[in-house]
Amino acid sequence: MNNSFEKEFQAYNLKMNIDSGTLITAHISDLHFPAMDPHKQYNILEDQFLKKIEAMPRLDLICVNGDLYDHKLMTSSDGTLYASMFVARLVEITKSHNATLILLQGTMSHDANQLKIYYHYMQRKDVDVRVVTNIRFEMVKNCRVLCIPELYGVPEEYYQHILFGSDFYDLCIMHGTIQGAVYGDNVGSGRLFRMEDFLNCKGPIIAGHVHKAATYYDHFY
């Protein structure tokens, strides 16, 4: 491990003997392959994300929180090639750390049901990969994780049941918008979420969709 990685781990107390009840997670979203040159994008991700999480002494959960793709692509395209290479590297890292990988569906016009390409990873017995395209809870190392992809036409009653009628949970990962994150709270056909929607969440809410790093209400990232 090089010195820069070691300093980062010390700063965040990422040690092997960290409390076993703490879930160590890595998140990324809105990669939008191939909005930029996909070969260049892959190299940037390898250097700035993949190598860093691979070097972590402990890692329990890796999440791609929506919009891996920018638009519907042909399977023979460079965009699909490099997106798939990126996912393959995530799978390798997941396996080497005995972690879990969650690929969350994002905006329909972007991901366009293309996460199906990675369903085959869920058939493997040697690595834990989950492709999530509907609202549900996932158990990861004794932690209850609420997964909310971007969906349309879901009755509000169903959201209320999941958010308030399903007991406490430890973490929420989602693709969507929290009130105040975008000007005018314009969410199109999606649902606008509010902080009070997550009263049952005992940990952070980590979302993709808005392309600007920010923290809202000290819990929503």
Where on the chain are the PLM-derived regions?
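Binuclear metal-dependent hydrolase catalytic cores centered on His/Asp/Glu-rich metal-binding motifs
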Residues: 141-198
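Extended active-site neighborhood of metal-dependent phosphoesterases/phosphodiesterases
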Residues: 5-17, 85-153
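Beta-strand-turn-beta hairpins that frame and shape the catalytic cleft
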Residues: 16-26, 137-147, 166-171, 218-220
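Metal-dependent catalytic neighborhoods of phosphoester/phosphodiester hydrolases
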Residues: 36-40, 66-91, 105-125, 214-220
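Conserved beta-sheet core of the metallophosphoesterase superfamily
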Residues: 184-221
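Histidine-centered catalytic micro-motifs
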Residues: 31-33, 173-177, 203-213
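N-terminal active-site segment of His-dependent metallophosphoesterases
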Residues: 1-85, 89, 159-168
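Active-site neighborhood of divalent metal-dependent phosphoester/pyrophosphate hydrolases
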Residues: 29-36, 59-79, 100-113, 169-170, ...
